[in-house]
Amino acid sequence: QFSSDISQDIKDEITNFILSNYNLTVISENFNVSSNLNPIYDTAYMLPYIIHNSIFKKNSLNFLKAFDVLEKAINITNEVFIGAPGIVNDMGIRKPSYYAYYLLSKLSENIVSLDDGYIVTKSLDYYAILLYSHNEDIYSLASYEDIYQKGAVKKSFERKYSLNIVNIKSSTRIITYEVNEFIGSSYNYWLSMGSPDRLSKEEKEILYKASYPKIEFKYSKKSSVLNIITELKGYGAKLIILKPAK
């Protein structure tokens, strides 16, 4: 994949060389190189935004990068979360955006059901149900000020679900992964610490270990209908894996 800054002549020349000499595929869509900072990149808002736009391919996500680079950032107010579009910060701490891709990676290609706010997939040995916060805010990338005000969410999202799964032919193991503004969000934990400009070694280790989805395990005996009651609060996502119990 090429940067949008590279001329078409150079792209064509390099593409021909790659295709002639290597068994590789060149992505035709350009990678957007942007130095713009937006604090929203660090927040849990990115979870539903990335999931929705990955599933429905509404908006390009090519502005995202693997890591923040502190040395290249200007006009920053701290060294922890600088509003850069990396899914991992400069210290190796995973942002909520990282876990959007983590949860998506657990889906299979066989889509059973799909709509705004959820997707259900099926593989040979398990179902995956991915729920995510859905409202008009995720249709286009918002600014931090549009979503948050003085550290609080302007528009609180809350939704309850009652899921009925039929044709389950055995007892079931239920594994749930949850990430949102209150659970697993490194940015929100950092806010709770008082938004320090720098982290000590101990603080860095704590934040690194704490920034992980909450995982729950449950067991359900075989029944004609498997009912799962759950909810989403704030910007976030929840993945429910259903596996036959052996």
Language-model segments: residues:
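Aromatic- and acid-rich polysaccharide-binding/catalytic face
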Residues: 1-35, 59-65
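Aromatic/acidic polysaccharide-binding cleft in carbohydrate-active enzymes
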Residues: 34-147, 185
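Hydrophobic transmembrane signal anchors and adjacent membrane-proximal interface regions, especially
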Residues: 2, 24, 82, 101, ...
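A structural motif corresponding to the C-terminal end of an alpha-helix
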Residues: 17-23, 53-61, 104-110, 164-168, ...
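C-terminal beta-sandwich/jelly-roll accessory domains of carbohydrate-active enzymes
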Residues: 132-246
